[in-house]
Amino acid sequence: MAVKVGSARIDENGKAHGGQAGEQNSREVSTQNWYLQSKGWSVYRAKNPSVAENIAKCMERACKNDKIGYDQYQRHTLYKAAEPLGFDVSKVTKACETDCSALVRVCCAYAGITGLPESFRTGNMPSNLNKTGAFTELTGSKYQSQSTYLGRGDILVTKTNGHTVVVLSNGSKYEGTVAQSTPDALGDRILKYGGEGEDVTLMQELLLKLGYDLGSWVCAGDFGD
């Protein structure tokens, strides 16, 4: 069975802003099957399973509430509407708006992580999630390039400015909470074909800057397979 994800995607006109408040076509804030993002995914898993469950639960409720739509210019109106309700978005009854990262911020707040800044966006999401101490970053193609090992409540965010989603169902080989691995620094180990990790990603980034063509691997942190 396909792994499902939920997110705030785009307004009813296929634009980032300017539509009517609230859900207009059942696709502005909605679920879909997991997909491999062209910009690549970074993966964050809550260390506490109950936090992960509440992140997923909030996203599901947002996707089902037709009072919640998409608009980058009004991205904080959902947060303001949900805050007095304990961030239970199922109780929001006035039409409001959010965007992908603002909605993840609301989901984290519902799970008890309320210190994320209003400026929380895909570009700074990794550093902000890491600062909370509540998440483990899962690296390598095992987590970033397939859905098999993903779990309900995982947060996926593009490696450059773009999009973020929350995983709503477990992959077939979901392992539960995973300890944070210490990445190898470039030069600490010999990189070989078939290797993966953050040091591989750094090597690929440096090769790209030098003009090398990496083909299908790009900067996925995967040295072939």
Please annotate each region the language model reported.
Residues 136-146:
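Short alpha-helix capping/helix-loop boundary micro-motifs
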Residues 116-123, 190-225:
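Short acidic, glycine/serine/threonine-rich helix-capping segments at coil-helix boundaries
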Residues 1-117, 160-163, 169-195:
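N-terminal capping segments
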Residues 150-154:
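Loop/turn positions that initiate beta-strands
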Residues 167-168, 218:
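Functionally important transmembrane alpha-helices
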Residues 111-137:
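Short, basic/aromatic beta-hairpin or loop at an interaction surface
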